[in-house]
């Protein structure tokens, strides 16, 4: 009997090829932590049969892989210069310069790099020939929207930061939805609601008049057609995949085309290298504390490093600290400095007692995944909002880097280590985070496949972006109701006055009788007229 198995296998293979898509990812030009997420996502997409391309500047370090390919272009940064630039920003912040000033400078570099990409005709023509099915935008660098428009390809947002932008279009009642960078929770008093409103207005003004116009000028410079505003491009996203989670985020209204996929990098702990395993195994009695401020913060200021070293040296626990730079003079004997460490594997070790961190989103999700309490010292960006949520959820303590003392840091560490409520809350949040349909990376690939299957999934998109400001806030309805109320007032006023005059007229006629013996002007005939006495009328014979 003839076997049809090879034919079925060939048919199945053909179906798989037909469903495969070409996807291009446009990561930000700096922040290696964002690139880690996209590499992980690209590998997951490869496993589902898709071909993924990362659009990166020349000289940016990334390990080669069969799971993705690279499209290089001459940009303003390579890995060395972008790291030096970022560290200079951190030194400026530590020296007292406003964080907002540094963020504006970062935005300027984003747009300069975007100008170089859009103006690179060889790059753009090469990308057009690829005929991509989908482009993934990281809104930290909005050039992805411009590239998608230039290529004429469907696009979706994958936000690697803790950011739920108003541009999504979801309702955001300021009474209980804290604005990004407000450092507020969903429980606000009057003054906090005032602050939240102020931050919201400043954010909208900043986006409308500072951020988006920079990219619009690039589109105008190169005469990109059809002409579109950045608002239209941002609103045109098929899907918004946000790196947050129900365990971390405050409950808020959302939309069908917004999905939470926070925790892409989380995974079970792997065995430690032999030298680290011996080190942590020697911390059986008191355990150990892990200290790391992420790949983006390599050099702390001397003042902060000394405060950390002093507080950590007073702990009975062992301490392992990811550290680069000059060794603090007051470093304790219990503290081990190391330039790189397997953070996830250490967080998953049974002897860990606490994590001292900058509050980076990837680090916090790994910490939550393993149920470890945390003390956070935010430095910039979404670190503050992330740690605000961690503290509000009872999983850790937030400290301000520019005001914290050695004693306060020591007390906070002792509190999260010795107070069991912090570990209990961390473990509960870990349960909530894991109790969802599939790992975050699998949920992400599912939704990417979904919008590919349904040609952008326009049925998920709300009509909020097709209505005007007046329609959204029902100002036209309010105007009509107000106008109706005013008209009703004048009509009722007119009718009331008319009825009053009629009644008064009838009453007046009844009072003006000329028959003897009846009232005339309210006075008995022949008695009084006004205040004086009057004569009787002559009798009629």
From Swiss-Prot:
Query: Which species is this UniProt entry from?
Result: Mus musculus (Mouse)
GO cellular-component term (any): membrane
Membrane topology term reads: Single-pass membrane protein
The EC code for this enzyme is 2.4.1.47
Pfam families referenced in this protein's UniProt entry, alphabetically: UDPGT (PF00201)
Q: Where are the transmembrane segments?
A: 472-492
Biased region (Basic residues) positions are 526-541
Reactions that this protein is recorded to catalyse: an N-acylsphing-4-enine + UDP-alpha-D-galactose = a beta-D-galactosyl-(1<->1')-N-acylsphing-4-enine + UDP + H(+); N-(2-hydroxy-hexanoyl)-sphing-4-enine + UDP-alpha-D-galactose = N-(2-hydroxy-hexanoyl)-beta-D-galactosyl-sphing-4-enine + UDP + H(+); N-(2-hydroxy-hexanoyl)-sphinganine + UDP-alpha-D-galactose = N-(2-hydroxyhexanoyl)-beta-D-galactosylsphinganine + UDP + H(+); an N-acyl-sphingoid base + UDP-alpha-D-galactose = a D-galactosylceramide + UDP + H(+)
Task: List glycan-bearing residues.
Answer: 78, 333, 442
Q: What class of enzyme is it?
A: transferase
Name of the molecule in the record: 2-hydroxyacylsphingosine 1-beta-galactosyltransferase
Q: Name one GO biological process term.
A: cytoskeleton organization
So which residues are the signal peptide here?
Answer: 1-20
Q: In which pathway does it act?
A: Sphingolipid metabolism; galactosylceramide biosynthesis
Q: What does this protein do?
A: Catalyzes the transfer of galactose to ceramide, a key enzymatic step in the biosynthesis of galactocerebrosides, which are abundant sphingolipids of the myelin membrane of the central nervous system and peripheral nervous system. Galactosylates both hydroxy- and non-hydroxy fatty acid-containing ceramides and diglycerides.
**Which residue intervals make up region (Disordered)?**
518-541
Query: What GO annotations for molecular function exist for this entry?
Result: ceramide glucosyltransferase activity; N-acylsphingosine galactosyltransferase activity; UDP-galactose:glucosylceramide beta-1,4-galactosyltransferase activity
What keywords does the record list, in alphabetical order? Endoplasmic reticulum, Glycoprotein, Glycosyltransferase, Lipid metabolism, Membrane, Signal, Sphingolipid metabolism, Transferase, Transmembrane, Transmembrane helix
Family to which this protein belongs? Belongs to the UDP-glycosyltransferase family.
Q: Where is it localised? A: Membrane; Endoplasmic reticulum
């Amino acid at each position: 009997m003839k076997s049809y198995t090879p034919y079925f296998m060939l048919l199945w293979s053909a179906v798989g090829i037909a469903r495969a898509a070409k996807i291009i990812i446009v990561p930000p030009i700096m922040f290696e932590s964002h690139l880690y997420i996209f590499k992980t996502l690209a590998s997951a997409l490869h496993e589902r049969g898709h071909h993924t391309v990362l659009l990166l500047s020349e000289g940016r370090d990334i390990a080669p892989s069969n799971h993705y390919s690279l499209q290089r272009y001459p940009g303003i940064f390579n890995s060395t210069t972008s790291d030096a630039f970022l560290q200079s920003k951190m030194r400026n912040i530590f020296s007292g310069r406003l964080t907002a000033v540094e963020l504006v400078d970062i935005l300027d570099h984003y747009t300069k790099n975007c100008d170089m990409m859009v103006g690179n005709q060889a790059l753009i023509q090469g990308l057009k020939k690829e005929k991509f099915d989908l482009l993934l935008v990281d809104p930290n660098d909005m050039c992805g929207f411009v590239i998608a428009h230039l290529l004429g390809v469907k696009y979706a947002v994958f936000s690697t930061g803790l950011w739920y932008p108003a541009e999504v279009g979801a309702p955001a009642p300021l009474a209980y939805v804290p604005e990004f960078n407000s450092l507020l929770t969903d429980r606000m008093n009057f003054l906090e609601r005032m602050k939240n409103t102020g931050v919201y207005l400043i954010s909208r003004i900043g986006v409308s008049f500072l951020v988006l116009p920079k990219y619009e000028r690039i589109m105008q410079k190169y005469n990109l057609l059809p002409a579109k505003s950045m608002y239209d491009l941002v609103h045109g996203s098929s899907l918004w995949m946000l790196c947050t989670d129900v365990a971390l985020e405050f409950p808020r209204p959302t939309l069908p085309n917004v999905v939470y996929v926070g925790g892409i990098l989380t995974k079970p702990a792997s065995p430690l290298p032999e030298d680290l395993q011996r080190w942590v195994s020697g911390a059986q009695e008191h355990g150990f504390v892990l200290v790391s401020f992420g790949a983006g913060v390599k050099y702390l200021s001397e003042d902060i490093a000394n405060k950390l070293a002093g507080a950590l040296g007073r702990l009975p626990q062992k301490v392992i600290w990811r550290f680069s730079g000059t060794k603090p003079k007051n470093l304790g004997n219990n503290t081990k400095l190391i330039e790189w460490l397997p953070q996830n594997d250490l967080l998953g070790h049974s002897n860990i007692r606490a994590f001292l961190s900058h509050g980076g989103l990837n680090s916090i999700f790994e910490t939550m995944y393993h149920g470890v309490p945390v003390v956070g010292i935010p430095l910039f960006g979404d670190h503050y909002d992330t740690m605000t949520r961690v503290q509000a959820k009872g999983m850790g303590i937030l400290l301000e880097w520019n005001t914290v003392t050695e004693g306060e840091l020591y007390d906070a560490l002792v509190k999260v280590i010795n107070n069991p409520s912090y570990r209990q809350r961390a473990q509960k949040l870990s349960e909530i985070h894991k109790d969802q349909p599939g790992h975050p990376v699998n949920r992400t690939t599912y939704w990417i496949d979904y919008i590919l299957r349904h040609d952008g999934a326009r049925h998920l998109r709300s009509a909020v972006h097709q209505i005007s400001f007046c329609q959204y806030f029902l100002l036209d309805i309010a105007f009509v109701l107000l106008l109706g109320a005013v008209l009703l007032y004048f009509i009722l006023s007119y009718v009331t006055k008319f009825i009053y005059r009629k009644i008064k007229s009838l009453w007046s006629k009844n009072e003006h009788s000329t028959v003897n013996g009846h009232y005339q002007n309210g006075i008995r005939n022949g008695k009084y007229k006004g205040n004086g006495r009057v004569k009787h009328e002559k009798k009629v014979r």
